[in-house]
């Protein structure tokens, strides 16, 4: 019997599944910012206090990320990701249920925990299955993530105004709509598990010490790693390179979530209508697509060593422009989007580039996302606190600039070709 197309080209089906999962990792949370005004008015909660709502997924990321790799190793990556998609759908529905505000908060917690699992496991899957095309597939992954987040940001306000029931759909209906792709992603992921020739290997946890999926000659990591250092008592948490990746991940995420949460209220305060303010957030994330897709090109050039440090420079220019020349608001938003998209793609690329094996990539991903999102969770709350304390936007935007400067500093170190859990830090070239 001749193998089916899915069997002969399992990588295509797996790639489609990975990208569809990525399409759900930001859309369910990026729509919150443009709806803060509606949520505040409906629930009677101060808009600045709702910065905590944006921080809850990040806190969940920090708490759950260290567990995700262990769950994948124990139960299989594909099964755990499937469960996370089901939980993501349940959390999205729960968050939109009418009644007590508890539904909003508890549903958001479940959403954050579900996204955290997929965030950690997918980079390890990409490292194993696409080791010869790591930068390109990672860029596509982050582009889908950013693109659907952009779409959600731009449509939630118009959707909230669509007639439905006794009035309009409102913010609850709009947030429910933000999870529209979850059922499709769940089905395609399940189909990929069942029909791919690689289903059994895909469902098996990534090896700890070094049997990544074979690729073209010279592309896969070695099966035996003579430079592999003992993991020691602290494992990846005791590795300096891992802490550099964590810092870079954390500062870029902190800056992004401050901006994506508060950009719409900032635009509204400058006299831009609510719908236009939501489109501004969409514009930020649409422009981040170009930033994400540019990273593979930058990593091939002579400036690859300095790419992590150069990316946040664009963000610094953009935020300075928002402060000094707000009349050019859309232009600064686009520039910041380019920086944020490239920052995210760079961060996810580092999980693979700074690890020799899929197992090491999974541990690095879990550690960096746990600590990184713990840093990021401070951002939206601190931004809202400064806004309430000072009554203006200057101090909060200066906090964003300080965060981007910290990302730049981390980028100076993480750009060096060194890998985690190795006796000799430099990665070297063969």
Where do the model's predicted regions map?
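Extracytoplasmic gate region of multi-pass secondary transporters
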Residues: 32-33, 240-292
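Helix-breaking motifs and short loop linkers at transmembrane-helix boundaries and internal kinks
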Residues: 44, 76, 97-102, 131, ...
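Helix-to-loop junctions at the C-terminal end of transmembrane segments
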Residues: 64-76, 291-304
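Primarily marks hydrophobic transmembrane alpha-helices of the MFS/SLC 12-helix fold
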Residues: 78-81, 305-309
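Helix-loop-helix hairpin linking two adjacent transmembrane segments in secondary transporters
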Residues: 100, 132-197
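Cytoplasmic helix-loop-helix junction between adjacent transmembrane helices
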Residues: 107-143
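A late C-terminal transmembrane helix in Major Facilitator Superfamily
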Residues: 358-400
């Amino acid at each position: 019997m001749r193998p089916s197309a899915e069997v002969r080209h399992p990588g295509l089906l797996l790639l489609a599944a990975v990208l569809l999962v990525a399409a759900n990792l930001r859309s369910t949370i990026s729509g919150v910012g443009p709806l803060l005004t509606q949520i505040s008015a409906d629930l009677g909660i101060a808009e600045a206090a709702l910065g905590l709502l944006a921080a809850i997924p990040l806190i969940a990321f920090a708490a759950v990320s260290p567990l995700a790799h262990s769950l994948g190793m124990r139960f299989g990556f594909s099964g755990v990701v499937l469960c996370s998609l089901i939980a993501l759908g349940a959390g999205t529905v729960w968050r939109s249920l009418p009644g007590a505000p508890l539904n909003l908060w508890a549903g958001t917690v479940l959403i954050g925990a579900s996204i955290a699992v997929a965030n950690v496991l997918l980079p390890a899957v990409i490292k194993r299955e696409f080791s010869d095309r790591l930068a390109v597939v990672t860029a596509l992954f982050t582009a889908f993530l950013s693109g659907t987040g952009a779409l959600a940001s731009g449509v939630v306000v118009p959707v909230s105004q669509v007639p439905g029931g006794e009035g309009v759909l409102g913010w609850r209906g709009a947030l429910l709509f933000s999870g529209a792709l979850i059922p499709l992603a769940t089905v395609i992921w399940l189909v990929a598990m069942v029909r791919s020739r690689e289903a059994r290997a895909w469902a098996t946890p990534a090896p700890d010490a070094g049997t990544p999926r074979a690729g073209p000659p010279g592309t896969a990591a070695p099966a035996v790693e003579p430079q592999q250092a003992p993991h020691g008592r602290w494992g990846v948490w005791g590795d300096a390179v891992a802490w550099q990746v964590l810092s870079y991940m954390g500062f870029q995420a902190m800056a992004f979530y401050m901006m994506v949460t508060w950009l719409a209220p900032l635009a509204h305060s400058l006299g831009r209508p609510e719908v236009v303010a939501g489109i501004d957030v969409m514009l930020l994330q649409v422009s981040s697509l170009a930033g994400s897709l540019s990273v593979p090109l930058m990593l091939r050039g002579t400036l690859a060593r300095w790419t992590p440090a150069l990316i946040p420079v664009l963000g610094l220019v953009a935020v300075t422009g928002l402060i000094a020349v707000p009349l050019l608001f859309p232009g600064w938003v686009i520039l910041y989007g380019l920086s944020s998209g490239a920052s995210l793609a760079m961060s996810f690329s580092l999980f693979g580039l700074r690890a020799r094996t899929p197992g090491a990539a999974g541990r690095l991903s879990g550690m960096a996302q746990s600590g990184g999102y713990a840093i990021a969770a401070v951002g939206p709350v601190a931004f809202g606190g400064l806004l309430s304390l000072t009554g203006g936007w200057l101090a909060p935007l200066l906090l964003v600039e300080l965060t981007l400067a910290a990302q730049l500093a981390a980028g100076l170190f993480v750009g060096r070709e060194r890998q985690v859990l190795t006796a000799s830090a430099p990665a070297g070239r063969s």
